[in-house]
């Protein structure tokens, strides 16, 4: 196969010469940088990165793929997705694009259609797309109201095993915390999650019982050795701020597991003093935050006949400045919560730069879809170009940020263990058997 910008060698040992790499993703090499980009030769041997050298200094006897200053990134980490919901849009669209419309549409579709075969077909379709785009780590939230929790976690466990050599998968139980009032259900859900090696999650809502609910969730997580990943404050309502309650609960219970909060949209609607105090508490509690810029911009401040007044995203800059681990992710894909998307972290990154103003400078921006989410997910071996690490790399013709962010990079080349993979995307027609033609 030929590529317009480089010719990958068919050899066990070779060098990607004259590459441009985001410095924030590189381990074991430093050099002069401009806008956070360095020039390097990357030596690959037997599927591993053997060395990272100054550009133009690799041993002459090695087979070479001249990148001609094209970028080389590590494979991506997509830390907040919904593989169980993916691609149901054609079967159950959101009639008005609203958050409540999405909830109702998904509930109806789940109750009518989410058999094991249906979930597996759509989940694997999504993973094939993600793999082709260059992703090697995904965390998915799974709708976990009974009896769906047992159906979806069983399918997930099977799919995780089948895909373990391509994409590392993690799963989070997603359910309204109000349902913990049913002790039998919550005990069964916790057992299912523990046996599947998953995480406890849920949707937090402002109510008089929020502190007790969070205490119960955290104690269950601690007793079962589970981490927590929550859907938080996905609303424009400034009266809603459960993020502060979550941080207080983590500190109150002395929880030592990892806690992640996704969305946190209403934080951006708070007065400066309230926002700053909340961010300080989040930092003290050691909570990580993931923003979902495409889905948040799609859903938030949507009112018929009215132009949206805000972007829907959380205070990512302020959180990061306070030392809070932060990242961005895909969220929903072609379902009632987001009608578009393909689990492509390049698209997510490109849109995040625009929506969240991650540019000017872009020096460390690449971290939000590589090193940061991988670290939050407990996989520091992923999302990095590291000496001794796997040659899991994504090669681009783009040489500079302006080039990278101005086109979809559809001509990218993905290497896994130093070998070029087939980047053919699955045909949507394959879903006709479950979604309908």
Swiss-Prot record:
Q: Which CDD domains match?
A: Bact_CD
Active site located where?
Answer: 234 (proton donor)
Names of the cofactor(s): a divalent metal cation
Q: Where is this site: Activates the nucleophilic water?
A: 263
Signal peptide from the UniProt entry: none
EC category name: hydrolase
Pfam family, any one:
Amidohydro_3
Under Enzyme Commission nomenclature, its number is 3.5.4.11
Q: Which positions are annotated as binding a divalent metal cation?
A: 80, 82, 231, 331
Q: Which GO terms describe its molecular function?
A: cytosine deaminase activity; isoguanine deaminase activity; metal ion binding; pterin deaminase activity; sepiapterin deaminase activity
Q: Which reaction does it catalyse?
A: a 2-amino-4-hydroxypteridine + H2O + H(+) = a 2,4-dihydroxypteridine + NH4(+); L-sepiapterin + H2O + H(+) = (S)-xanthopterin-B2 + NH4(+)
Q: Which UniProt keywords apply?
A: Hydrolase, Metal-binding
Superkingdom of origin organism = Bacteria
Q: Which InterPro entries match?
A: Amidohydro_3 (IPR013108), Metal-dep_hydrolase_composite (IPR011059), Metal_Hydrolase (IPR032466), Metallo-hydrolase_Enzymes (IPR052349)
- Which positions does UniProt annotate for substrate binding? 85, 331-332
For this entry, list what GO says about its biological process: cytosine catabolic process
Q: Which family does it belong to?
A: Belongs to the metallo-dependent hydrolases superfamily. Pterin deaminase family.
Cite the NCBIfam families for this sequence.
PRK07583.1
Function, as annotated = Catalyzes the deamination of many pterin metabolites, such as formylpterin, pterin-6-carboxylate, pterin-7-carboxylate, pterin, hydroxymethylpterin, biopterin, D-(+)-neopterin, isoxanthopterin, sepiapterin, folate, xanthopterin, and 7,8-dihydrohydroxymethylpterin. May be involved in a degradative pathway for catabolizing pterin rings.
Q: What is this protein called?
A: Pterin deaminase
Q: Which organism is it from?
A: Rhizobium rhizogenes (strain K84 / ATCC BAA-868) (Agrobacterium radiobacter)
- Gene (UniProt): codAch2
């Amino acid at each position: 196969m030929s590529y317009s910008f480089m010719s990958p060698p068919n050899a066990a040992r070779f060098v990607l010469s004259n590459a441009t790499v985001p410095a924030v993703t590189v381990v074991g090499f430093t050099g002069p940088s401009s806008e956070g980009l360095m020039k390097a030769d990357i030596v690959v041997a037997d599927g591993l990165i053997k060395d990272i050298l100054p550009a133009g200094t690799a041993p002459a006897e090695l087979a070479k793929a001249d990148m001609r200053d094209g970028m080389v990134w590590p494979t991506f980490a997509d830390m907040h997705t919904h593989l169980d919901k993916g691609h149901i849009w054609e079967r159950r669209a959101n009639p008005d694009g609203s958050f409540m419309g999405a909830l109702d549409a998904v509930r109806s579709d789940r109750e009518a259609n989410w058999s094991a075969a249906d979930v597996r077909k759509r989940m694997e379709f999504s993973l094939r797309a993600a793999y082709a785009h260059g992703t090697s780590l995904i965390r998915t939230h799974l709708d976990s109201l009974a009896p769906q929790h047992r159906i979806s976690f069983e399918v997930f466990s099977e799919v995780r095993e089948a895909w373990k050599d391509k994409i590392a998968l993690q799963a989070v139980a997603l359910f309204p915390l109000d349902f913990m009032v049913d002790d039998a259900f919550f005990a069964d859900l916790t057992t299912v999650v523990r046996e599947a090696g998953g995480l406890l999650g849920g949707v937090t809502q402002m109510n008089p019982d929020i502190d007790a609910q969070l205490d119960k969730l955290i104690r269950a997580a601690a007793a079962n050795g589970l981490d927590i990943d929550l859907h938080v404050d996905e609303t424009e309502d400034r009266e809603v701020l459960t993020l502060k309650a979550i941080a207080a609960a983590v500190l109150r219970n002395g929880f030592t597991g990892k806690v992640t909060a996704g969305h946190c949209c209403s934080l951006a609607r708070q007065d400066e003093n309230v926002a700053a105090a909340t961010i300080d508490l989040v930092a003290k509690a050691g909570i990580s935050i993931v923003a979902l810029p495409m889905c948040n911009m799609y859903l938030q401040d949507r009112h018929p006949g009215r132009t949206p007044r805000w972007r829907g995203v959380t205070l990512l800059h302020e959180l990061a400045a306070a030392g809070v681990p932060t990242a961005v992710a895909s969220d929903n894909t072609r379902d009632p919560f987001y009608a578009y998307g393909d689990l492509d972290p390049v698209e997510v990154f490109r849109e995040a730069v625009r929506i969240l103003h991650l540019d000017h400078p872009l020096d460390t921006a690449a971290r939000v879809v590589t090193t940061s989410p991988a670290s939050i997910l407990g996989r520091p071996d992923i999302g990095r170009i590291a000496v001794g690490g796997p040659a899991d790399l994504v090669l681009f013709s783009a040489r500079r940020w302006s080039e990278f962010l101005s086109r979809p990079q559809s001509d990218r080349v993905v290497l896994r263990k130093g070998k070029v993979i087939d980047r053919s995307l699955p045909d949507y027609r394959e879903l006709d058997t479950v979604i309908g033609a």
